[in-house]
Each structure stands twice: as C-alpha cells, then as structure tokens.
Amino acid sequence: MNNNDLVAKLWKLCDNLRDGGVSYQNYVNELASLLFLKMCKETGQEAEYLPEGYRWDDLKSRIGQEQLQFYRKMLVHLGEDDKKLVQAVFHNVSTTITEPKQITALVSNMDSLDWYNGAHGKSRDDFGDMYEGLLQKNANETKSGAGQYFTPRPLIKTIIHLLKPQPREVVQDPAAGTAGFLIEADRYVKSQTNDLDDLDGDTQDFQIHRAFIGLELVPGTRRLALMNCLLHDIEGNLDHGGAIRLGNTLGSDGENLPKAHIVATNPPFGSAAGTNITRTFVHPTSNKQLCFMQHIIETLHPGGRAAVVVPDNVLFEGGKGTDIRRDLMDKCHLHTILRLPTGIFYAQGVKTNVLFFTKGTVANPNQDKNCTDDVWVYDLRTNMPSFGKRTPFTDEHLQPFERVYGEDPHGLSPRTEGEWSFNAEETEVADSEENKNTDQHLATSRWRKFSREWIRTAKSDSLDISWLKDKDSIDADSLPEPDVLAAEAMGELVQALSELDALMRELGASDEADLQRQLLEEAFGGVKE
C-alpha cells in the first residue's frame, strides 16, 4: 500500500472519532502519538526511543477501559521520559478520546493497515511523508488558526530548490509552523547526496543533529513540527529538545538562535496582537512581519541567502516600513520578488510575495552598503485563476518562474526580461510609473527588472511594483459614493441572511434559526420600533 492510500485510510478513521466529538486538529494530535509508536515498531527502533512496557504492542494487547487508561498513562510517562527528544514530543500531551471503543478502533485499524510495499518495510522518511500528508489534510479542513496560513507545498518546494541548501549549511525557519521548509531542505540535500550516503560520518551527523533549526511559538504546533522532523530522521540538537525549539522569535529566544546560512520562512500574518515583541530592533515597530524581516537580516551569516513570504503591506508600509526596506536593500542584495496569486493560502484574499535576497553580496559578503543594484519581479498574480480546492495551486504554476530565476541560488544567473506564461500577452498594461518609456510588448511580460535608483526615485523605496492590469479591476473614479456602497453591501447581507433563515427552517432547524436571529438582534442592540 503506498503512502497516499495510507493517508486516505488514516484520515477516514477520523470520521468515527468526529462522531464522538474529536475535532480534526485533535485527531491529528492523536495520530501524532500513535504514529510515533507505530513507526518505532515498524522500523525496529523501539529500544532506541521507547522504554520497555510503553510500546505499541503494550498498548495493542489491552482492550476496553484498561486500554484507554493505559493510553493516558503512557502519554504522561513518555512526557517525563529521560530521553529529551521523546519528552519534547510527548510533553503535556493528553488525549481527547473519552470512549474506550474509540481508542480500540483506532489502534486495531492502524495495526491492520498494510504498512509494506511488496517485500520492503516503511522507512522513517516514508512515515514522515505520510504524516505530512495528514498535516495537509488537516490544513484543508481547518481554515482557522494555523491551518489558514499553511504554506502550499509546491511553493515550499520551489523556494528550497532555488535556494539549493548544501551539506553543512545551517537552515533556519524562525516561524517553523509544522516544519515544512526544514523538511523540504532536508529532502533536497538527501536527493543530492544519495540519501546522505555520499557524505562522511561527521557530516552525516551534522545533517541529522545540527543542520536544521526552527522556532515555534505555539506548543501544539511545535509538537507537530517535532514529530514531522523526527519521522524524517531529523533529530536536531537533543540538548534543546530537537530541531524545533519552543519560543518567541521576537523575544530573547530569537536572539539566541544560531546564525544561519539559509533562512526560509513564512512568518504569521496579521497584527501583533498576542505576540509579545520584547526584542530591541534597530527599527522598533509593532508590525510582526517587519520585525521578522529584521530578525532574518540579523541572523544570516554574511553571504547567507533567504526567501521570505510576506504580505503586501511589508512592501509599501511607510515610516518604519520604509526604513526597514532601505536597510534590507543596503545590507542585502535583494535580487528577486515573486508576486504570488491570491487564494493559495487557506485564508482567502491574503495577498503575498516572496522576497529572495543574499546578505551582503557574493563578491563581498561583509558589504553592508548599496548591496542591491537591480530587483527582478515576477508577477504570478495578475489575471491568474482563483486558486482553491477546485483549482489547486501546483508545481506547474511555478515552473515558468523557476526557469527565469536560473540555477544560481543568489539570483546571479544570466537573466533577460520577458516571460509571457498564462496568456500574459493578452493582458492590458497599467498606466503607471513601471510602464513609462517601456516597450509595449515588454510591458505585458510577467518578468521585469527595476533598478535600485528607479525604486528610490520613482517609488520612494516602496517595493509594491506592478505593471499589468487585472481584467477584473475597477477604476476607483467610477465607483459610487462610500455610503452608497455600504448600503448596497448591507442590503445584500440582509437578503442573504433572510434566505439562510428560510433554508434552515425548511431543513427542520427552526430552533437553531431562532437562536441565530436572537444573536443578530443582540448584536445590533435589539430591534427598534
């Protein structure tokens, strides 16, 4: 049975648990515990990680209430284990399963799955790929919390393949999430080194224990990331509880991270609410993304390279935002910006970009002034499909960008303006600074070059650079007055709510409809006579 089949079967088991009140997120947490136990069993590593009496067969041999009680005891015991990595994975873990039949069904079904491909058993990487598939499934179903900003795997793959991590390079993700960037970086290095077999023993040990470092603020997410790393044979620094540390990048934890040769990350979007920015940055700001940008510049080794997913506001925000962009273009060679399409994150409407840069320059890694000369921009946003479940974002959508980016990880491959994928030639051009004195044919290209001097004089150091006109865009001058727009929107909402109310009553949910109507009346301060 291949991994896709196993992922589908494991996910299907969730239906039984959901009937018992277990959410998708909690189900993934349950699977994280059970999959670790099963992985140790199938790969013959139980003695390496698990104490006697707390292994897969010990859980499987019990039934009913005894099995559920033992499972609870097992989680507590492993969370206090002498092995720091096991302790980190199971620290403060508890189960949301309340009925013995649920854990019995889960264990027996997992045990009955065909974990083998022909005569070959599953490797740790096989279990890791399977686990990543489950995380992807969870992101598809969980459109709030961490799930809404789950970085699409095709984008992660492209970023890592362009950065080209090498053996003995430290790769850092200061907003690790479920460790997707680190896992892909490890996968890339293994693909270039015959699964590390071409490396000497000391370098192999470096790759397993020191090459990949992440920091994650949320304990539950950090646990998922640790499990992901461990299942991919990335153990990390055992003194720090594995490859993913728990802490706040915008505080002292971020300052204590070791310097990196590569940073690949997707910092959390949104305001600074809930995030305690206690670190002193050169340009103090409450904008989380701008603080992360400063951290990345600081944490890179001279000559190190980075790719960072940022929302549009990082490109144009004034004040400290302008200062930080100037700092970036001074201290780093910002060579490439990829404008991403909307809809590729589960938070619909989020507009994002990827900034690719090198600290200093390749010629002089310690250079800290005037490092940026030309910035190349690829527009993968304008007039692209609305991506989502029905139109998935795939590797093919990124291939034209990969081709023009070139083979050099610092963006120094020979480049030529002009790339017309996805019917770009049919696109109208905007009346903007970007298109002044520009050949009409080139103005329809998705791939353009802009000088540092032009960015300074024409854009006042804004990096919000676009030149193609969206066919669905509306001229602001032709819009109605704001109060008219607001009234129209309110009218459409009232109509939609009325139709939903009628539908709920037709479906026999009158009590729920009455409750929702009451909540609406309370929200608007009651109905006025």
Curated annotation (Swiss-Prot):
InterPro entries given in the database record: D12N6_MeTrfase_N, DNA_Adenine_Mtase, DNA_methylase_A-5, DNA_methylase_N6_adenine_CS, SAM-dependent_MTases_sf, T1MK-like_N_sf
Keywords on record: DNA-binding, Host-virus interaction, Methyltransferase, Restriction system, S-adenosyl-L-methionine, Transferase
E.C. number(s) listed in UniProt: 2.1.1.72
An annotated GO BP: methylation
Keyword match DNA-binding: yes
Superkingdom of origin: Bacteria
Pfam family for this entry, one: N6_Mtase
Expression induction: Encoded in the hsd locus, in the order hsdR-hsdM-hsdS. There is a promoter upstream of hsdR and another between hsdR and hsdM. This probably allows expression of the methylase enzyme before the restriction-specific subunit.
PROSITE patterns on file: N6_MTASE
Protein family membership: Belongs to the N(4)/N(6)-methyltransferase family.
Name of this protein: Type I restriction enzyme EcoKI methylase subunit
Species per Swiss-Prot/TrEMBL record: Escherichia coli (strain K12)
